[in-house]
Every structure is written in C-alpha cells, then in structure tokens.
A protein has these predicted regions:
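Helix N-cap at the start of a conserved alpha-helix in ABC-type nucleotide-binding domains
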Residues: 36-38
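ABC ATPase "signature
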Residues: 85-86
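Hydrophobic anchor residue at the start of the ABC signature
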Residues: 14
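Conserved catalytic motifs of ABC-family nucleotide-binding domains
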Residues: 21
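Helical segment within the ABC ATPase nucleotide-binding domain
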Residues: 40-53
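Catalytic Walker B motif of ABC-type/P-loop ATPase nucleotide-binding domains
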Residues: 25-28
C-alpha cells in the first residue's frame, strides 16, 4: 500500500475493515494530514458506511467541523474525562453556543488563551 496516496490508504483501510461486517468501527483521526479532496472523499465514505451498514462508528477527531458533519452524537473528552455524549444540537443548546469549538471551551471551563498556555507548558515539560 506504500505506493498509494495517504487518502487512498485511508479509503483502503476503511474498506478492509468493512470486509468482516463489523458491529463497531473505530476511526482515529481518519482525515488528519489529507489534502482537501481526499478528506472529502474519506468523509463521504464514512457517511456511506453509516448509511449502508448497521454499525456503530466511534470517530475520534480534533476537527470540530468534521465531528459536526459526520456525527449523530458528540462527546468531548477533557483530560481523560468524558464531559458529555449528546446530539450536536443538544450540545450547542446546553452551552448556548453556535459551534462545537465554543462548546468545548465552555465544557472544559477554559478559554482559547488558557488552552494555548497549557499546551505550551506541556511542551516544555515533555
């Protein structure tokens, strides 16, 4: 598979996973590092899998827009703690926000600036 593009590798990996008709499909950052066209193709493939197969898909992503586009329900993990697992609209309503990114900051009690400072501190400690 090394001669395939990263996007094609992702699609082949997803297709291989479906050969066994799984009841649970775990996808960890399936579109990270892909060019825009490949990212859309993988997202379309995930939607197709949701539509055609009776499987639960657990999608881990840092891309809040992608999560909103692909998920029926979203959960936010903060330092290993699951803050909630709800439909996207309920998450936004719960925090009175318009985006999942805003919901993340509301759920974790941190602002963007604080998150950035903590990330820098972690980098220094590493």
């Amino acid at each position: 598979m090394e001669h395939l593009s990263r996007g094609m590798q992702q699609k082949v990996s997803l297709a291989r996973a479906l050969l066994t008709s799984p009841v649970l499909l775990l996808l960890d950052e399936p579109t990270t590092g892909l060019d825009p066209r490949s990212k859309l193709e993988v997202q379309d493939f995930i939607r197709e899998v949701r539509t055609l197969h009776d499987a639960t898909i657990l999608l881990c992503t840092h891309d809040m827009v992608e999560a909103e586009m692909l998920a029926e329900r979203v959960g936010i993990l903060d330092r290993g703690e699951l803050k909630f697992l709800e439909p996207v609209d309920e998450v936004k309503a719960r925090f009175g926000v318009e985006t999942l990114e805003e919901a993340f900051f509301a759920a974790t009690g941190r602002s963007f600036e604080e998150e950035t400072e903590e990330d820098r501190d972690r980098e220094v400690m590493a």
